[in-house]
Amino acid sequence: MASGVAVSDGVIKVFNDMKVRKSSTPEEVKKRKKAVLFCLSEDKKNIILEEGKEILVGDVGQTVDDPYTTFVKMLPDKDCRYALYDATYETKESKKEDLVFIFWAPENAPLKSKMIYASSKDAIKKKLTGIKHELQANCYEEVKDRCTLAEKLGGSAVISLEGKPL
């Protein structure tokens, strides 16, 4: 079921900026987004970038010690969100980076919010082409342990996430 909610151009631009890893100056790399949250506009007609809810690559190691833990803390406990997380992980063979689409629908969110977000998920996923990994979570227990994300990225082959061993 489609909800009629549109995806704003800003969301698509952020996604394309995160997806394309072109050679950049160190200053440009620091400004790349590591994680972002998307929410519904106040009139519930558009999916937009949530202001102030992002982690920049340049923040990691400076103001952000563990980007994954910081990201989990950004998720609201009483409302739904969509998120993009640029995961850096290691398998037994190599180091990898992949974008993960996350649908956050906590149990404490209002039913109407859960319904709108659930029915709009396909609209945003169609615009974010090339996403290999998706995670849906309904409580902090499901996301606070980095093993849940590692499982989505490659299961037992993943040995570390964000430089932290599993």
From Swiss-Prot:
Stored CDD domains: ADF_cofilin_like (cd11286)
Question: Where are residues bearing Phosphotyrosine located in the sequence?
Answer: 68, 82, 140
**How does it sit in the bilayer?**
Peripheral membrane protein
Q: In its keyword annotation, does this UniProt entry include Cell membrane?
A: yes
**Where does the record put the Glycyl lysine isopeptide (Lys-Gly) (interchain with G-Cter in SUMO2) cross-link?**
132
Q: Name one GO biological process term.
A: cell projection organization
Output the PTM entry: Inactivated by phosphorylation on Ser-3. Phosphorylated on Ser-3 in resting cells. Dephosphorylated by PDXP/chronophin; this restores its activity in promoting actin filament depolymerization. The phosphorylation of Ser-24 may prevent recognition of the nuclear localization signal. Phosphorylated via a ARRB1-RAC1-LIMK1-PAK1 cascade upon active ligand stimulation of atypical chemokine receptor ACKR2.
**Which PROSITE patterns does the record cross-reference, listed alphabetically?**
ADF_H
Q: In which tissues is it expressed?
A: Widely distributed in various tissues. Not found in skeletal muscle.
Subcellular location, record wording: Nucleus matrix; Cytoplasm, Cytoskeleton; Cell projection, Ruffle membrane; Cell projection, Lamellipodium membrane
Q: Which SUPFAM superfamilies does the UniProt record give?
A: Actin depolymerizing proteins (SSF55753)
Q: Which Pfam families match?
A: Cofilin_ADF (PF00241)
GO terms for MF:
actin filament binding; phosphatidylinositol bisphosphate binding; protein phosphatase binding; signaling receptor binding
Give residue numbers for the modification (Phosphothreonine): 25, 63
**InterPro entries found in the cross-reference section:** ADF-H (IPR002108), ADF-H/Gelsolin-like_dom_sf (IPR029006), ADF/Cofilin (IPR017904)
Tell me which residues bear N-acetylalanine.
2
Q: Which family does it belong to?
A: Belongs to the actin-binding proteins ADF family.
Name of this chain's protein: Cofilin-1
Organism for this UniProt entry: Mus musculus (Mouse)
Q: What is the lineage of its organism?
A: Eukaryota, Metazoa, Chordata, Craniata, Vertebrata
Q: Which gene encodes it?
A: Cfl1
